[in-house]
Amino acid sequence: MSTVPQIALVGCGYWGKNLCRNFHSLSALSAVVDATEIGHETARSIAPNVRVTKSFDNILADDQIHGVALATPAETHADFAFQAMKAGKDVFVEKPMALTLDDANEMKQVAHETNSILMVGHLLEYHPAVLKLREMIASGDLGKINYIYSNRLNFGKVRTEENALWSFAPHDVAVILRLIGEAPVEVSACGGS
C-alpha cells in the first residue's frame, strides 16, 4: 500500500484556505505555516488535527514532510521555494511563480540541481473544458490554430504587490501554451482604465 506524501502549506489566507481544505481532504496535509493568528485560526477550523506553526524552519527540518505548497504573497515565492528545495522538499507554488524572470529561472535551476519537483498552480490547465479543447486540437478537429484571443473577466481580488499582468495573465498564458504545445510567434496586448 502506498503512503500519501505529506505536505506543509505555507500561507492560509485568501487562497491558502482552499489549498488547506483540498490537501486536508486528501489526507496529505501535515502542517500549516502562517505568520498570522487569523491564518492559524483558519487552518484549525479547516484541519483541526493538523500542526499549525509560524516556523518555516521547523517544516524544513521535518523529514516526514515531503513537500510544501506556497500560498504566500508573490514576492515571497522565490525565497520560500529556494529554502524548501535546498532542504529536499518538492514545491507547489501558486501563481505567479515569481515576480522576475531571473527568479523564475533560478527556481527552475535549483529544482534541477536538487532533483526537486517544482510545480506552479495553473489549475485551469486541468479544467474539463480545457482538457476537451486540448483533445480536439490534438486530433485536428479544429484545424490548424493560427490565432487565440483571450479576454480576462472575473478579476477577483485586486493585489497591490504585483501588477495586473502577474496577477491575471498567468492562467491565460498557461492554458494557451498547454492547448497549443508550442511557443507563440507573436503576442500583442492592450489595456485601459
What are these regions (language model features)?
Residues 31, 67, 147:
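Short, Asp-centered acidic motifs that coordinate Mg2+ and/or phosphate
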Residues 75, 98-159, 172:
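A contiguous active-site-proximal alpha/beta segment in oxidoreductase catalytic domains
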Residues 155-193:
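Rossmann-like dinucleotide-binding domain that binds NAD(P)(H)
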Residues 18, 42, 58, 67, ...:
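Alpha-helical elements of Rossmann-like donor-binding domains used by nucleotide-donor carbohydrate transfer enzymes
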Residues 1-47:
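N-terminal Rossmann-like dinucleotide-binding module
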Residues 47-110:
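Beta-loop-alpha module in the N-terminal Rossmann-like domain of NAD(P)-dependent dehydrogenases
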Residues 54, 93, 120, 188-191:
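Short loop/edge segments at beta-strand edges and connector loops
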